[in-house]
Amino acid sequence: MSNIASVEVELGGHRIEQEDIDELLAAGRNSLDPDGRMILHAQPTLYTLDGLQGVKRPLGLHADKLGVDIHVVCADQSPIRNIDLCVRSAHLGVESIIASPVATGLAVLSEEERELGVALVEIGGGVTNVSLFAGGMLVGLTSIPFGAADITDDIASAFGARRNQAERMKCFYGSATASPRDNHDMIEIAPMSSEDEGESHRITRAQLIAVIRQRLEHLVGEINAALKELGFTGPVGRQVVLTGGGAELKGMADYVQGVLGRAVRVGRPRGLIGLPDAHSGPGFATLAGLVYYAASDPIDVRVIKPHHQQVIRSDHQGLLEKLISAIKTAF
């Protein structure tokens, strides 16, 4: 669940100091109402000065009223607690729980894309997350309750195949786009059980792609509706980045681009030196993003440091140095 909480404080026209921003964010923290859910993130987006919206850095400016929109990401408590319990049962500690788009955006989106406006579509196994970035930050999020695993189930049901074989067919022979040659390429499907030896059958690649396309039409239609609901239209709505395991389907970017009428690319983890090729695909983007998140210093109104305790972050400090610093602090 994603929503925007707005808060405003009186300044009396004086120059905005860091203490004023801290006071505003503290007021925002006190105004949060999760409605029984667990807050994962409460990040300030853009500020307002006397009603003028879209100010990214108000420090040093003058205003009678200073406001901020806080993007709040919540989730039902029970699933989050179950995930936490599973990880701790494996004798691992949990530092924090991060919403997938927050981490994935760090791994696959460039700073310019996040500034100008971009939609990030994560096609996972059972859920597709659609998020919107603008002004350098996450400003909207919604989820669609199906994903790439539904394509696998459709293939298994349509051709009487086992799920593991259906997944293999999707990965090796599947495509989001069709060609005339697909009618001549044959795919052999093994029997459902070992007792049915000799009863394998064959289908054309065109038949497989037809089943995949039917599910994709539904999925991309839901993605398009979600983008419109988030306000992803006009000049800001020109760039879409696909990621997640479902984005690895052959021809996926071309198909989505044709349906949405927007520029579409597949997002892969970037900037991590030494990442194996097998782990550099879109299916590993969230894991890579968690590394970035752990090495960064994200702003959250629930954890506000007094001005004299704030650490000035340097853009010149590399990811490796940040990780080493974090390890030294922990041990």
What are these regions, as identified by a protein language model?
Residues L120-V127, F133-G136, P145-A149, G244-L249:
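A short acidic Gly-Thr/Ser loop motif
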Residues A75, G174-A178, P235-V259:
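Glycine-rich phosphate-binding loops at beta-strand->alpha-helix junctions
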Residues V259-L287:
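Conserved phosphate-binding/catalytic loops in two-lobed NTP-binding clefts
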Residues V220, N224-Q239:
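Phosphate/pyrophosphate-binding loops at sites that engage ATP/ADP/AMP, CoA/4′-phosphopantetheine
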